[in-house]
Amino acid sequence: MAIILGVDPGSRITGYGVIQCLGRQQLYLGSGCIRTSGEDLPLRLKQIFDGISEIIRQYQPDEFAIERVFLAKNADSALKLGQARGAAIVAATVANLPVAEYSATQIKNAVVGTGRAKKEQVQHMIQQLLKLPAAPQADAADALGVAVCHYHTNQSLVALSGRATTRTYGRYR
């Protein structure tokens, strides 16, 4: 039984999703968005850190998974996104959680079956997979997708090796 916190980082809106895995079953525990306020980037990063830290305290996850930075058209946006990811990763590290990272293509492939899926397709499949009454908000759905991707990746590793491994700090342990 593992609880996984998935995060879809953003400097303005950071989505989070929490699932519990019981064997092959994935149960929805919660999801939402951390909406930062103000123009001051350091303050927004603190809000992300504090928000993720509170979610960790509330749900007590065993594992943490986050979306990797994608190539943005605007270099400034990519840097801000990287800093938002850093704030979330530090919150997980402070809580001694193993950190796993996945590309958007890996996440979409795990959830929808194709790495080129649209946001609406991810929302729909998350609703179906987790048996939700309605599709979650886009950022929350993406975060739940990160958690589902992490679950499926670990299940594949278990099947291949007979034991689970988690990617942490760029290495497996």
From Swiss-Prot:
Indicate whether DNA-binding appears among the record's keywords: yes
Identify the residues that bind Mg(2+) 2: 67
Matches recorded under InterPro entries: RNaseH-like_sf, RNaseH_sf, X-over_junc_endoDNase_Mg_BS, X-over_junc_endoDNase_RuvC
Molecular-function annotations in GO: crossover junction DNA endonuclease activity; DNA binding; magnesium ion binding
CC cofactor: Mg(2+)
Single GO cellular component term: Holliday junction resolvase complex
Reactions performed catalytically: Endonucleolytic cleavage at a junction such as a reciprocal single-stranded crossover between two homologous DNA duplexes (Holliday junction)
Residue numbers annotated as active site? 8, 67, 139
Identify the residues that bind Mg(2+) 1: 8, 139
Q: Does the keyword Metal-binding apply?
A: yes
Question: Which keywords label this protein?
Answer: Cytoplasm, DNA damage, DNA recombination, DNA repair, DNA-binding, Endonuclease, Hydrolase, Magnesium, Metal-binding, Nuclease
- Record-linked SUPFAM superfamilies: Ribonuclease H-like
Q: What biological processes does GO assign it? A: DNA recombination; DNA repair
Query: Pfam families annotated for this entry?
Result: RuvC
Q: Where in the cell is it found?
A: Cytoplasm
Question: Entry cofactor note text?
Answer: Binds 2 Mg(2+) ion per subunit.
Q: What is its EC number?
A: 3.1.21.10
Assembly and partners are described as: Homodimer which binds Holliday junction (HJ) DNA. The HJ becomes 2-fold symmetrical on binding to RuvC with unstacked arms; it has a different conformation from HJ DNA in complex with RuvA. In the full resolvosome a probable DNA-RuvA(4)-RuvB(12)-RuvC(2) complex forms which resolves the HJ.
Q: Which HAMAP family match?
A: RuvC
Q: Which family does it belong to?
A: Belongs to the RuvC family.
What task does this protein carry out? The RuvA-RuvB-RuvC complex processes Holliday junction (HJ) DNA during genetic recombination and DNA repair. Endonuclease that resolves HJ intermediates. Cleaves cruciform DNA by making single-stranded nicks across the HJ at symmetrical positions within the homologous arms, yielding a 5'-phosphate and a 3'-hydroxyl group; requires a central core of homology in the junction. The consensus cleavage sequence is 5'-(A/T)TT(C/G)-3'. Cleavage occurs on the 3'-side of the TT dinucleotide at the point of strand exchange.
NCBIfam families given in the database record? ruvC (TIGR00228)
- Name used for this protein in its record: Crossover junction endodeoxyribonuclease RuvC
Annotated source species: Shewanella sp. (strain ANA-3)
Point out the gene that encodes the protein.
ruvC
